[in-house]
Amino acid sequence: MQKSLITKWLCINCIMVIATIVIGGITRLTGSGLSIVEWRPVTGILPPFSFESWQSEFAKYKAFPEYNSVNYGITLSQFKFIYLLEFIHRLLGRITALIYIVPVIYFYFKDVIKNRDMLPYIIALLLFCVQGFIGWYMVKSGLLNSPYVSHFRLAFHLIIAVIIYHILFYQLIKNRCDILLIPSQTDFKLPLIFSGIAITVVYVQIFLGALVAGLDAGLIYNSFPLMDDRFIPMEIKDNFFDLKNWYDPVFIQFIHRLVGYSVFLVVVVLIICLLKIEHPKLNKIAYFLMIALFMQVSTGIITLLYSVPIIIASIHQLFAIILLSVIIWCYFLIKSF
């Protein structure tokens, strides 16, 4: 009974974290992230209701660089759209944190979660507590002289969310999945190594994807597989190792492509390793990996070719999480044996 309760709670948390990540991506893609210029963790749980309240929020927004440099002259109705997107993202983050924090404290004191199992839950709790601060730290970078948030802070904010999801999803499958019964002579060394490598490169790729979004690097070189008929674009060919390149959208897009190829190759090798084991559950994971990889690669290419359509770009981000989830599931099953 207790195990079932924990499983359902973790499942709800995983869904909520994914939803928050996707809404956060849409908020970035629509340029809505700087529409709320204050951080009020408690009093900010309700949106403006009256016309006067909306006018007050709009007046605050007009005092910051984004209005004057990017959105000068927008109407109140247009402001409401971007404001509500950012509001929903923040509200969803608060709700997700509450759904996690309150039950985990209850489960601990009621001994539903044993002391020996508490470490990952405590780490997730701490990350939930700091994530709001990190989000505001990111937003604050776009409220100073430049109307654009730091792409590094944006990537850090996303990676913390992904780490939270990783911890919760791992605990979910730990509660839900049975250990595989496979003959002892089966060699798991290669699939274990490649599942670990796959998790690492997907994390790197998600981080790079956030840098691409932060610099609007998806709006340039909208061709595939080459960048203006070149593998390495001219802008970075002669100064490839310059640290300043990490502020250059051309370089960031190139590295995102490069790591994307690495993700594809590593996951394909992992799929081959799983199919060679000839176990129904691992074979099923291999097929799930094929689907997730295909969707991730195809939506990424479409996002690039069509200059970042919001729906496709959001699906691309979603499938990055789905691909990561399947690899984590694979890693757990192999490691548990």
UniProtKB/Swiss-Prot annotation:
MF-aspect GO terms: metal ion binding; oxidoreductase activity, acting on NAD(P)H, heme protein as acceptor
Presence of the UniProt keyword Disulfide bond in the record: no
Membrane topology, as annotated: Multi-pass membrane protein
Pathway recorded for this protein: Porphyrin-containing compound metabolism; heme A biosynthesis; heme A from heme O: step 1/1
Residues that bind heme: H256, H316
Co-factor requirement: heme b
InterPro entries: COX15/CtaA_fam, HemeA_Synthase_type2
UniProt-annotated location(s): Cell membrane
Entry's transmembrane regions: 6-26, 87-107, 119-139, 154-174, 192-212, 258-278, 285-305, 308-328
GO CC terms of this entry: plasma membrane
Enzyme Commission number: 1.17.99.9
UniProt catalytic activity: Fe(II)-heme o + 2 A + H2O = Fe(II)-heme a + 2 AH2
Coiled coil: none
First-listed, main subcellular location of the protein, grouped into a coarse class: membrane
GO biological process: heme A biosynthetic process
UniProt keyword list: Cell membrane, Heme biosynthesis, Iron, Membrane, Metal-binding, Oxidoreductase, Transmembrane, Transmembrane helix
Similarity section: Belongs to the COX15/CtaA family. Type 2 subfamily.
Function recorded in the entry: Catalyzes the conversion of heme O to heme A by two successive hydroxylations of the methyl group at C8. The first hydroxylation forms heme I, the second hydroxylation results in an unstable dihydroxymethyl group, which spontaneously dehydrates, resulting in the formyl group of heme A.
HAMAP family with a match to the protein in the record: HemeA_synth_type2
Assembly behavior: Interacts with CtaB.
Protein name per the record: Heme A synthase
